[in-house]
Amino acid sequence: MNFNYFILVLFFITSGHAKSETREVHQEAENHIKRGSNTGFNFKTLDKEKRSAEEQNLAEHLVTRGSNKGFNFMVDMINALSNGKRSAEEQDLAEHLVTRGSNKGFNFMVDMINALSNGKRSAEEQDLAEDLVTRGSNKGFNFMVDMIQALSKGKRSAEDQDLAEDLVTRGSNKGFNFMVDMIQALSNGKRSAEEQDLAEHLVTRGSNKGFNFMVDMINALSNGKRSAEEQDLSEDLVTRGSNKGFNFMVDMINALSNGKRSAEEQDLVEDLVTRRSNKGFNFMVDMIQALSKGKRSAEQEKDMK
């Protein structure tokens, strides 16, 4: 009898402890969202047990839906879901991105989507960020359209502008379909007519003014719109030689200028292009190489259509 009573007491204690841990987990997630400094790696909040039901539904929707296969890059980056589709080295890198407390630079995704650092942007930018989070139509995908659109030609140098125009207009760059795939997502019915018109406009027009999001993220050209701390971080991302994991962003901008990276990094990029596995990781191939159709398999090309 005493033993049964002891077991019952132990059950209630452990049950209460589990509930306490759950509350702590959710509180940690809420703290990630609410805090203004946003110095931590906020993708931790996207773990299944650490997000709200609404966020979980969105995440599961991104994973399970059959269309818009190209959008799986988001799942790969956030959750490091590799299940045999990437090498051990890549898996270690992915897990490292998720688990480590540093890597402040990778917060750009959280900042842009969830508008976490309110004090670090202008009122106009804050309104845009809040709109991305709160509006009801296609919440998950609008950040891409707005990020790409929202800026003007006058905010970058002539050299940057030439690069952006070249990416859109040159005929050789067939592999740069990531822009088409991410914007259009091959599922027109999932956005409003206005958004669809914008997406088609981004694909067909020659000026491609909307490509400024990339320049702004990396080169911090609109200095007046961010704090000194953010400006230093942006410049640091471009100039520093460390933090190899974040070099994919620099690689996307500089389009494989071999002299601008180490041999090790170059080998990694070439490996991403040549191997046939890890289809979900094709966003990296597309964004880094931005090269020709011949560098992917027929099956991969079919997935992009």
UniProtKB/Swiss-Prot annotation:
The modification Lysine amide is found at K153, K293. GO terms for cellular component: extracellular region. Keywords: Amidation, Antibiotic, Antimicrobial, Cleavage on pair of basic residues, Secreted, Signal. Residues 19-35, 52-65, 87-100, 122-135, 157-170, 192-205, 227-240, 262-275, 297-305 form a propeptide. Expressed by the skin dorsal glands. It is found in: Secreted. GO terms for biological process: defense response to bacterium. Residues 1-18 form the signal peptide. The keyword Secreted applies. Its main location: secreted. The modification Asparagine amide is found at N83, N118, N188, N223, N258. Belongs to the maximin-S family. Maximin-S1 has no antimicrobial activity. Has no hemolytic activity. Maximin-S2 has an activity against mycoplasma but has no activity against common Gram-positive and Gram-negative bacteria nor fungi. Has no hemolytic activity. This is Maximins-S type B/C.
